[in-house]
Amino acid sequence: MPQSQRPLYIPYAGPSLLETPLLNKGSAFSKEERGSFNLTGLLPPRFESIDEQAERAFRQYSCFQTNINKHIYLRAIHDNNETLFFKLVQNNLAEMMPIIYTPTVGDACEQFSDIYRSSRGLFISYEDRFNIDDMLRNATKNKVKVIVVTDGERILGLGDQGIGGMGIPIGKLSLYTACGGISPAHTLPVMLDVGTNNQKLLDDPMYMGARHKRIDQDSYDEFLELFISAVKRRWPNVLLQFEDFAQPNAMPLLQRYKDRICCFNDDIQGTASVTVGTLLAACRSKGSKLSELNVAFVGAGSAGCGIAEQIISQMMNEGLGAEQARSQVFMVDRFGLLTQGMGELRDFQQKLVQSNEAIAEWDIAGEFASLVEVMHGAKPDILIGVSGQAGLFTEKVITAMKSHCEMPIIFPLSNPSRQVEATPSQVINWTQGQVIIATGSPFDPIEYQGKTFPIAQCNNSYIFPGVGLAVVAANISRITDGMLQVASETLAAASPLANGESDELLPPLTSIAQLSRDIAFAIAKVAYKQGLALELTDDELLAKIEHNFWKPEYRQYRRTSL
């Protein structure tokens, strides 16, 4: 009997059952269940299916005029009836993904203390650092398989949001379930509250987080060690995703813990994987290889450098040597092109500097090459923005790029949409429509000279749900670069544009559940070859993936005593 058809034995009854979001069915409780669970009279008399409930919920949702109010409404359903919430989201994924995650989740993080209704997940403050084991035991979910954790310091392109950063793990895990089939019973959002340096929040009487500046680095490192160790004791096989940690901590945390626990940083590795997958699709659509092209970045933080390193790995997979691959990648930060001799660079940036000899023939006015000078000197075929600064891709920059590249690939990826380096409309106009474009935030299609340009959203949700599904289905113990590379390849293989099926660079969101299955399968195969997963035949692996792919369906309940 399929798991969804097996009855669940439930110890709760009456209001306690209705107040348990993972179990509440609302008006869908049958007559027999209402009698068995002391629900008679607590609900309207009509029995409804989940489809009828979802139709009513969508009508209510549609009455809200602003995205933030739609977000608040969906969170209310999430906190009341998780099965209905995910049914509603899956039925309307393209409409609701920008509401439950980027860009609207950015507004929700900024307004967290103002719109707070009820608790979800764990809030672990530095002051409680010696009680973390007890706090993890307080979690209402015993079989946690995926944790998303943040410290709220670098939320999207919005900076330090303190405790408001909790909106990101909640939203991210919603997509693990909606897109990757991870059961909501197995997910846990965690906020590590180490204070905030956002004075506006500290001065806000409604702010719900710890009212002090962020703790010093030694205290921070001690706190993270206590947290990771406690998680390993409680759930030794969990997948831990680091989310929206600031640059000074993001890469060091990943390097410190990647061999101690199954973990990854979505801002670094997930962003890199989806970007490389989208680039591969773009390259194939124009009949070229990534290794044949030059790439320029605006933004040399942990995310940008993470993408660059995966691009270099892909170029090497295509036959280039490491030195040649690195010579084709140009990183621009706020001071200019990363170059030998530039001061105050982090270790991960040092590996991506250009030699002084390589740019000796360039026409450079200042100490370091500007973005426009990089366009003329490097002649990049690809331009990627991960700066978090709006407007950096000016008309002068784009026209300089277009002067040497017939069909440039331009990805302004910064989130939220108000932080984007250039809008799709601007890029299309400045290139006379001769461009392949993808963005980090959702944008409507652009009409230009009688042609419609669909705008691909280079969204990490194409990748991380499949990573989670692979870990859960195949008991993967570590995440490796090879797994993320095969995820990129799987995404590229699904590109309608590269396959000549349509003008869409990335597959539609309606197919993301199947894409997550395909990515999970590919990752699990690599994991087994690397000795990091179960040994399974292809048929066994497919069955495992399907068995673990949760669907928002009500199950029959039977009562048991506590």
Swiss-Prot record:
- Gene Ontology MF terms in the entry: malate dehydrogenase (decarboxylating) (NAD+) activity; metal ion binding; NAD binding; oxaloacetate decarboxylase activity
Q: InterPro entries, per this entry?
A: Aminoacid_DH-like_N_sf, Malic_enzyme_CS, Malic_N_dom, Malic_N_dom_sf, Malic_NAD-bd, Malic_OxRdtase, NAD(P)-bd_dom_sf, NAD_malic_enz_proteobac
Its catalytic activity? (S)-malate + NAD(+) = pyruvate + CO2 + NADH; oxaloacetate + H(+) = pyruvate + CO2
**What name does this protein carry?**
NAD-dependent malic enzyme
Give Gene Ontology CC terms.
cytosol
Which residues bind NAD(+) per the record?
154, 267, 415
SUPFAM superfamilies (UniProt xref): Aminoacid dehydrogenase-like, N-terminal domain (SSF53223), NAD(P)-binding Rossmann-fold domains (SSF51735)
Can you tell me which residues bind a divalent metal cation?
A: 243-244, 267
Annotated coiled-coil segments of the chain: none
Give the record's cofactor note, including how many are bound.
Answer: Divalent metal cations. Prefers magnesium or manganese.
One example of a Gene Ontology biological process annotation: malate metabolic process
Q: Which family does it belong to?
A: Belongs to the malic enzymes family.
Report the active site residues. Answer: 101, 172
Superkingdom classification of source: Bacteria
Q: What is this protein's gene name? A: maeA
Enzyme Commission number(s) of this protein: 1.1.1.38
The cofactors named for this UniProt entry are:
Mg(2+); Mn(2+)
The subunit structure is: Homotetramer.
Give the positions of the site Important for activity: 267
Keywords noted in UniProt? Metal-binding, NAD, Oxidoreductase
Which top class of enzyme applies to this chain? Answer: oxidoreductase
